[in-house]
């Protein structure tokens, strides 16, 4: 993030697309401006939009391929230049555009010798290919080559366990992320009480949607996220109505753990989030990447489980232990904590 002093005038809050271009079929660029914002607001909006753009925008991609009787993904098929793994990687790069929901079937069925490109994929009517020239494989001999594909619309990065499938079906680690990158910069304008901020937002997409469409969808997702809070009072929401549902009080981490010591039932461990453990950013990010979100998740892990987490170190383990040992009852540590 860059901060720079520039001249400007106060005006009604508005946004505008100041630059838009198509670098290639799979690379669109857009630059947007939002102003005037009060001091600190540009950061708030910039961070929220960046996260929503990178993590909340849905995309369509190929998630599975079935070759027939192929023993493993490192196999080679007679008459095809690429290995099965290389073909899977090429299929992973195919950019699709659609509004479908759920899983759809597609296929490739060609006869060599010839090059196979994305144009050869037989798709359902609701799906289209962004770049039909994307390569898939090269058939060097006159063979019949068929692949059954599965297509799914999702968000984020989806992975599946690698294993041999007897029917020749292999998962593809799907990148359902149409937004390739997002940058924002903040410029300060004016002097004294007239000082305000201008937010510049840069968005790169893979061509399945434009940066303007991505910005619209991200903004809509953020609005939908906060709508329940706006309607809570109108709908007369009362937590007393949900007597069977546990509602955690707004305590600090220390107060919650003190409650655990005083009350045998205490607060459910799945209602204490690791955000409240006052961990270092590095340790916190390691746990988040391993889908450890609550104290219950953490206490369910062994030392071996934690050390298998990417970039997790013994210092992180000691830091977590010191924090828990300071606040948790000893008997709970013995019963729950495996390290």
Curated annotation (Swiss-Prot):
Main location: plastid
Record key words, sorted: Chloroplast, DNA-directed RNA polymerase, Nucleotidyltransferase, Plastid, Transcription, Transferase
Region of interest (Alpha N-terminal domain (alpha-NTD)), residue spans: 1-233
Reaction equation(s) it catalyzes: RNA(n) + a ribonucleoside 5'-triphosphate = RNA(n+1) + diphosphate
Gene3D superfamilies in UniProt: 5' to 3' exonuclease, C-terminal subdomain, DNA-directed RNA polymerase, insert domain, RNA polymerase, RBP11-like subunit
This protein's GO CC annotations: chloroplast; DNA-directed RNA polymerase complex; mitochondrion
Subcellular locations according to the entry: Plastid, Chloroplast
Domain of life: Eukaryota
Keyword Chloroplast listed: yes
Similarity comment text for this entry: Belongs to the RNA polymerase alpha chain family.
Subunit structure: In plastids the minimal PEP RNA polymerase catalytic core is composed of four subunits: alpha, beta, beta', and beta''. When a (nuclear-encoded) sigma factor is associated with the core the holoenzyme is formed, which can initiate transcription.
Function: DNA-dependent RNA polymerase catalyzes the transcription of DNA into RNA using the four ribonucleoside triphosphates as substrates.
Domain remarks in the Swiss-Prot or TrEMBL record: The N-terminal domain is essential for RNAP assembly and basal transcription, whereas the C-terminal domain is involved in interaction with transcriptional regulators and with upstream promoter elements.
Name under which the protein is recorded: DNA-directed RNA polymerase subunit alpha
Species: Elymus hystrix
């Amino acid at each position: 993030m860059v901060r720079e002093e520039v001249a400007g005038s106060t005006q009604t809050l508005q946004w505008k697309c100041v630059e838009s271009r198509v670098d290639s079929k799979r690379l669109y660029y857009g630059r947007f401006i939002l102003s005037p914002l009060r001091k600190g607001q540009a950061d708030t909006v910039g961070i929220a939009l960046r996260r929503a753009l990178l993590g909340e925008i849905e995309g369509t991609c190929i998630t599975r391929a079935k070759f027939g009787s192929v023993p493993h993904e490192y196999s080679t098929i007679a008459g095809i230049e690429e290995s099965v793994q290389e073909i899977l990687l090429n299929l992973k790069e195919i950019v699709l555009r659609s509004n479908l929901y759920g899983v759809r079937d597609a296929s490739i069925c060609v006869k060599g010798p010839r090059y196979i490109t994305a144009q050869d994929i037989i798709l359902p009517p609701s799906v289209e290919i962004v770049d039909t020239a994307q390569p898939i494989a090269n058939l060097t001999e006159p063979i019949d080559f068929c692949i059954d594909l599965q297509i799914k619309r999702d968000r984020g990065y989806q992975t599946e366990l690698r294993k041999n499938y007897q029917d020749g079906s292999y998962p593809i680690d799907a990148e359902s992320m149409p937004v390739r990158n997002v940058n924002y910069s903040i410029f300060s304008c004016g002097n004294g009480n007239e000082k305000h901020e201008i937010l510049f937002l840069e968005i790169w997409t893979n061509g399945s949607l434009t940066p303007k469409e991505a910005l619209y969808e991200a903004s809509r997702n953020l609005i939908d996220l906060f709508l329940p809070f706006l309607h809570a009072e109108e709908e007369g929401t009362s937590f007393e109505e949900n007597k069977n549902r546990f509602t955690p009080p707004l305590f600090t981490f220390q107060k919650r753990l003190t409650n655990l010591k005083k009350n045998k039932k205490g607060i459910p461990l799945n209602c204490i989030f690791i955000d409240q453990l006052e961990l270092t950013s590095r340790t916190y990010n390691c746990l988040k990447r391993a889908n450890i979100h609550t104290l219950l998740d953490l206490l369910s892990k062994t030392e071996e489980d934690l050390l298998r987490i990417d970039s997790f170190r013994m210092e992180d383990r000691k830091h977590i232990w010191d924090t828990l040992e300071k606040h948790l009852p000893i008997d709970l540590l013995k019963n729950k904590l495996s390290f």
